[in-house]
Swiss-Prot record:
Lineage: Viruses, Riboviria, Pararnavirae, Artverviricota, Revtraviricetes
CC per GO annotation: host cell cytoplasm
Pfam families, alphabetized: Cauli_VI
Domain of life of the organism encoding this protein: Viruses
Protein name per UniProt: Transactivator/viroplasmin protein
Length: 522
């Protein structure tokens, strides 16, 4: 009897060892399949390995316990420690999972699921902020040609600060960096100056205008504010906005002047001219070139503009003038779809050796336009006026004064805009109010002086004197009286010319305050 029990115990031990060998073989096969990357296996490898390891852990203490005697040999109940339970577990685990994976998936991070990564910036872009590294397009670029802060800017605020209060600075706006760079290179090459640098937004360092100012200016101190009892002082007024239009040169003016004299109406139906003996003025219809309108406006060579409803033709005129036209369309006429006109009276520029001396002054009338009947443009004889531009400026100045004084005869006027050198008005259904009348008188007193062209012009002075005396007023010019006293003390053969040009080397003296009667100003 004891021999039978020993044999049965030996049988159980051998069965356990056999099961252990089978488990090792299965584990070795699983590892070999994972290393070879077999794609034909569709099973949950981690679950099986976990089951095998749990079985091995159970077999670790190789100690067999005696089982109770059975009714018949070989009819024992199933041993729960046998490895035969592994296939059942594997099948149950496999049915629980919907997605089948391969062993190679477990060697990859995140079980083979790719995680989207952020795209790296293009390595071709240079790290520095040079012109080639501009990735985002800007609406405009500004070239400041000269002055202490010359350069190419991509920010309106920096460029405006670089030009405010700087006399004689030249600047212009461009749509692209390529155009701005080309214009800057042309200027620096002609002036034999250094190449202008590109100054991005935030990197502009505006220095004092001169070393003298830097030495004499005291260092700024931070204001110390008290919580109570001290009123915070108001900030300094913002500087006047500077338009980014390059100053009209004498060559530009002579080109436009000659273009108007030679224009015969062929090739462009958006422009026609009004001609007289000495000058031809442009009239612009719908769809005219807005850049040409701007150049002609700055040269004082426009008579009339007939803009479209969207006002695209005048988009490059000064902002306040455009705003005045928009307000007239929306507030002063019932049908906003009606065509309008801008009738302009202007002086022309005057130059001296140092540059532009006088910018044109403008009186603009806005009104509702009827059917346009353009006059036939005629090619006129063009003369070289480079030597007698002062005479031409004097004639246009006298005509400008006459048109400004005619406002005194109009009783129904609405003033749309009053600036230092521009007056915009329109006809009104009501009588002119006192506020508008004062605005007109103030503009007349500021503009109608012998210094209308930027210097004391005897011809303008005599014209004002004749006009005022014709109206029954009194006029006296201190500058002319002083000149007469000098002439009386001079020798008999000395003569005084009726026309004088602008001073070429001396500073331009300030505008004289001429005495006029109340009738002269309306």
């Amino acid at each position: 009897m004891e021999d039978i029990e020993k044999l049965l115990l030996q049988e159980k031990i051998l069965m356990l060892e056999l099961d252990l060998v089978r488990a090792k073989i299965s584990l070795a096969r699983a590892k070999g399949s994972m290393q070879q990357g077999g794609n034909s296996l569709h099973r949950e490898t981690p679950v099986k390995e976990e089951a095998v390891h749990s079985a091995l852990a159970t077999f670790a203490p190789i100690q067999a316990k005696a089982i109770p005697e059975q009714t018949a040999p070989g009819k024992e109940s199933t041993n729960p420690l046998m490895v035969s339970i592994l296939p059942k577990d594997m099948k149950s685990v496999q049915t629980e999972k919907k997605r089948l994976v391969t062993p190679m998936d477990f060697l990859r991070p995140n079980q083979g699921i790719q995680i989207p990564q952020k795209s790296e910036p293009n390595s071709s872009v240079a790290p520095n902020r040079a012109e080639s590294g501009i990735q985002h397009p800007h609406s405009n670029y500004y070239v400041v040609y000269n002055g202490p802060h010359a350069g190419i800017y991509d920010d309106w605020g920096s460029a405006k600060a670089a030009t405010n209060g700087v006399p004689g600075v030249a600047h212009k706006k461009f749509a692209t960096i390529t155009e701005a760079r080309a214009a800057a290179d042309v200027y620096t090459t002609a002036q034999q100056a250094e190449r202008l640098n590109f100054i991005p937004k935030g990197e502009a360092q505006l220095k004092p205008k001169s070393f003298v100012k830097a030495l004499t200016s005291p260092p700024k101190q931070k204001a110390q504010w008290l919580t109570l009892g001290v009123k915070k002082p108001s900030s300094d007024p913002a500087p006047k906005e500077v338009s980014f239009d390059q100053e009209t040169t004498m060559d530009d003016f002579l080109y436009l002047y000659d273009l108007g004299r030679r224009f015969d109406g062929e090739g462009d139906d958006t422009v026609f001219t009004t001609d007289n003996e000495s000058i031809s003025l442009f009239n612009f219809r719908k769809n005219a070139n807005p850049e040409m309108i701007r150049e002609a406006y700055n040269a004082g060579l426009i008579r009339t503009i007939y803009p479209s409803n969207n006002l695209q033709e005048i988009k490059y005129l000064p902002k306040k003038v455009k705003d005045a036209v928009k307000k007239f369309r929306t507030n002063c006429i019932k049908n906003t779809e009606k065509d309008i006109f801008l009738k302009i009276k202007s002086t022309i520029p005057v130059w001296q050796d140092q540059g532009l001396l006088h910018k044109p002054k403008h009186v603009i009338e806005i009104g509702v336009s009827k059917k346009i009947v353009p006059k036939e443009s005629k090619a006129m004889e063009s003369k070289d006026h480079s030597e007698d531009l002062i005479e031409l400026a004097t004639k246009t100045g006298e005509q400008f004064i006459q048109s400004l004084l005619r406002l005194n005869d109009k009783k129904k006027i609405f003033v749309n805009l009053v600036e230092h050198d521009t007056l915009v008005y329109s006809k009104n259904t009501k009588e002119t109010v006192s506020e508008d009348q004062r605005a007109i008188e103030t503009f007349q007193q500021r503009v109608i002086t012998p210094n209308l062209l930027g210097f004391h012009c005897p011809s303008i002075c005599h014209f004002i004197k004749r006009t005022v005396e014709k109206e029954g007023g009194a006029y006296k010019c201190h500058h002319c009286d002083k000149g007469k006293a000098i002439v009386q003390d001079a020798s008999a053969d000395s003569k005084v010319a009726d026309k004088e040009g602008p001073p070429l080397t001396t500073n331009v003296e300030k505008e004289d305050v001429s005495t006029t009667s109340s009738k002269a100003s309306g």
